[in-house]
From Swiss-Prot:
Keywords: Coiled coil, Endoplasmic reticulum, Membrane, Transmembrane, Transmembrane helix, Transport. One of its GO terms (biological process) is tail-anchored membrane protein insertion into ER membrane. Residues 42-99 form a coiled coil. Required for the post-translational delivery of tail-anchored (TA) proteins to the endoplasmic reticulum. Acts as a membrane receptor for soluble GET3, which recognizes and selectively binds the transmembrane domain of TA proteins in the cytosol. Belongs to the WRB/GET1 family. Interacts with GET3. It comes from the Eukaryota. InterPro entries: Get1, Get1_fungi, Helix_hairpin_bin_sf. Residues 25-110, 173-206 are cytoplasmic. The chain crosses the membrane at residues 5-24, 111-131, 156-172. This is Protein GET1.
Length: 206
C-alpha cells in the first residue's frame, strides 16, 4: 500500500521538524500570525500595545516632573498613569487568557494531526502489511519481528515501518544539521582568516 507507506514517512518528517524547531517556537509564530488577522483578538492586541505605550509615556513624564516644584502637574500625571496602568493590566490579562486558549487549541490540533493520526493509523492498519518481503529472503525469526504485532508473516507491519522511518529521518536530519553547522563554521573561519591577512598586509604597507 504505497499511499500508507508514504503517509507514515511524511508524518515522521513533520514530527521531526516540529520537534527540531520546537513546539513553543511554532506556537509563538502562529500566535503572531493570528493576531495580525482581522479578528477581535487582533483588535485587543493592538489596544494592549497602545495602552502599554501610553503607560510608558506617562511614566516618563512623571519622572521628568518634580513632585515638589510642580506637584499639581505631577499629581495629575500620577492619576492618569495609575488609571492607564489599571486598564492596561486588565487588557493584558484578557489577552493572556486568549493566548492560553489559542495555545491549547493549537497543541490539540497539532497532536491530532501528527501523533494522534500516527496512533490511529497504527491501530487501524495493524493487520495490513506495508509491503511484502521476498519468500525465503530472511529467516523466519526476523520475519516475525518485522511483521510484529499483527501483520501477516513475511511482511512489514506499519509499526515496524513507522519505527524505521523515525530512525532514518532522525539520522538524516542530524546529518544535515551537522553538515550545515560545519559549513557555517568553515565560512566564519575563512572570513576571520581573510580579515587577519588583510590587517597584516595593511600593516606592511604602512
Amino acid at each position: 500500500m504505497p499511499s500508507l507507506l508514504i503517509t507514515i514517512l511524511l508524518l515522521n518528517i513533520v514530527i521531526y521538524v516540529i520537534n527540531t524547531i520546537g513546539a513553543a517556537t511554532i506556537d509563538s509564530l502562529l500566535w503572531l500570525f493570528y493576531i495580525k488577522l482581522p479578528t477581535g483578538t487582533s483588535h485587543m492586541a493592538r489596544e494592549q500595545r497602545r495602552l502599554k505605550r501610553e503607560v510608558i509615556q506617562l511614566k516618563r513624564e512623571m519622572n521628568a516632573t518634580s513632585s515638589q516644584d510642580e506637584f499639581a502637574k505631577w499629581a495629575k500625571l500620577r492619576r492618569r498613569h495609575d488609571k492607564a496602568l489599571e486598564t492596561y493590566e486588565a487588557k493584558n490579562n484578557e489577552l493572556t487568557q486568549c493566548k492560553s486558549s489559542f495555545d491549547m487549541t493549537v497543541k490539540s490540533v497539532r497532536w491530532a494531526a501528527t501523533s494522534g493520526l500516527m496512533l490511529f493509523l497504527q491501530f487501524w492498519y495493524s493487520k495490513r502489511p506495508i509491503f511484502t518481503l521476498p519468500p525465503g529472503w530472511i529467516p523466519w525469526q526476523v520475519q516475525w519481528v518485522l511483521s510484529f504485532p499483527r501483520a501477516p508473516m513475511g511482511t512489514v507491519s506499519i509499526q515496524i515501518w513507522g519505527g524505521a522511518c523515525a530512525t532514518v529521518v532522525a539520522l538524516v536530519g542530524d546529518a544535515v544539521g551537522a553538515t550545515m553547522g560545519f559549513v557555517s563554521a568553515s565560512k566564519k573561519e575563512g572570513m576571520k582568516v581573510g580579515a587577519g591577512v588583510g590587517e597584516k598586509e595593511g600593516k606592511k604597507s604602512q
